[in-house]
């Protein structure tokens, strides 16, 4: 096989970084076997990742491939110091070196610095389950270098409150959003202050007393207008807060009693009934023409007559004096005698005209 084809099948020759790139770029790796030798990563961590997260494993593989390609050309290649070395379960990268003057919390506004940090973090978060547990301590160590807003975001992972996610891409994407956009951090982690709720769901009674007083005053006014009485002001007993603390039964009884007093008129004399209504045995109603005096009897209550002393009564012997008023008993006796004596018109005609004259006969 031609020598050029063998070179095309092998990997590219690593390009050593220039001095300015090595000084400006914080991503520097140290060879553990030969200290002091600095080199750039042989593979881009965002394009091609090693199998176990170890860069030594990748370099050993490349050296073995170079040896195989050299053997194809018939010229053995020199083996490096790491040729044939088994990859270790723990990565041998040194800790990430921050650029002087940069803030790990905001990364000093340098997106490339954040990308390199996430790249190193991704090397320790292996895709193989057998290396994942060994790399957790290194991941936490890298997260511990964060400060500011990013440190607050990584605190649950460092404290053990949240487990490290299995999906590393989402983990890095979330961290990148938090570091670059502080508003997203405030959205997910800010504590919104809220006032403490009241011990009771009901509002305090003291603040509602003026409203209750106005409502009761309007209620009493409307009720007084319906009852036809003059409206009265709110009682002082109901305006005090102590009245609201009593039971509702006593309040309603007090209100009803006051409304009853308002609707009841003042003391009046009992109505004077006619003498005919006072009789226990009602008689037949006679026409007004036959009994003109009894049709409209003079209502004289017995209480007024009994209150007058006997000395003030007029003397019946004097003809010029006023006619003495009859008592209620005399009126009843007179009415009874008249009812007995009254009869048909024929009986009235047959009655004797005088005490000494004989009765007149109508027959001729």
From Swiss-Prot:
Annotated localization: Mitochondrion
Gene Ontology biological-process annotations: mitochondrial outer membrane permeabilization; regulation of mitochondrial membrane potential
Primary residence: mitochondrion
Signal peptide (from-to): none
Gene Ontology cellular component terms for the protein in this record: mitochondrion
Keywords: Apoptosis, Mitochondrion
Region Disordered, residue ranges: 67-88, 258-364
Biased composition range(s): Pro residues: 311-322
Superkingdom of origin organism: Eukaryota
The protein's assembly and partners: Interacts (via BH3 domain) with VDAC1. Interacts with pro-survival Bcl-2 family members, BCL2, BCL2L1 isoform Bcl-X(L), MCL1, BCL2A1 and BCL2L2. Interacts with BAX and BAK1.
Known role: Could induce apoptosis in a BH3 domain-dependent manner. The direct interaction network of Bcl-2 family members may play a key role in modulation of RTL10/BOP activity.
Comment, domains: The BH3 motif is required for pro-apoptotic activity and for interaction with pro-survival Bcl-2 family members.
Protein name: Protein Bop
